[in-house]
Amino acid sequence: YTQEIVDNCKVIGNDDLLLVAGDISWAMNIDEAIPDLRYISALPGKKVLTRGNHDYWWKGIGSVRAVLPKGVYAIQNDAVKFDNVVICGSRGWTTPEPNAIEEAEDKKIYARELLRMEMSLTCAKNLCSDGDKIIAMIHYPPFNSKFDDSRFTELFDKFNVSAVVYGHLHGKSVRSETVVSKNGIKYYLT
């Protein structure tokens, strides 16, 4: 898959943004993640990262930012601005399926991730000037398998987000709908 990444990045210019919505490295600690961060840094464009569920090396935003190569930015409960685009995000959590029984721990994590996303969106809004666009990053899909609205999509509506980039899903079978439009917002599966 790394060759596919390199091939896809050939269309990216140095002034473009490359958004990586989590699962950045299989490393278990920050030192082991540095080669992967350098690999990402060597790709064209300005890179923005958010944490995924397999990023065990990502213990805290301060330690992550301390080792990031030039041109690579990490967001967690905050946002970063490039010209007229503000990028914000959070890891998110699994959105429940209709009529599914949710575990108490899942409810707790989902609620916490909603708060984190709202903090990030608030930060983004505070960085915005007239005409700026907000792009949100979330590792987990912000909706269930039926693409139903969720508390995450409601937050994106509330903050007038222009687009959302998400990941987490693996394999070709889940890539049937890589772009979904909901309530005027485009959601991109990366």
Give the location of each predicted region.
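Conserved catalytic scaffold of divalent metal-dependent phosphoesterases
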Residues: 58-148, 155
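Short, flexible micro-motifs
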Residues: 25, 55, 92, 169-170
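Core catalytic region of metal-dependent phosphoesterases/phosphodiesterases
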Residues: 1-83, 150-161, 183-185, 189
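Acidic, low-complexity terminal tails and accessory targeting/binding regions
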Residues: 166-186, 190
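Histidine-centered catalytic micro-motifs
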Residues: 136-143, 162-173
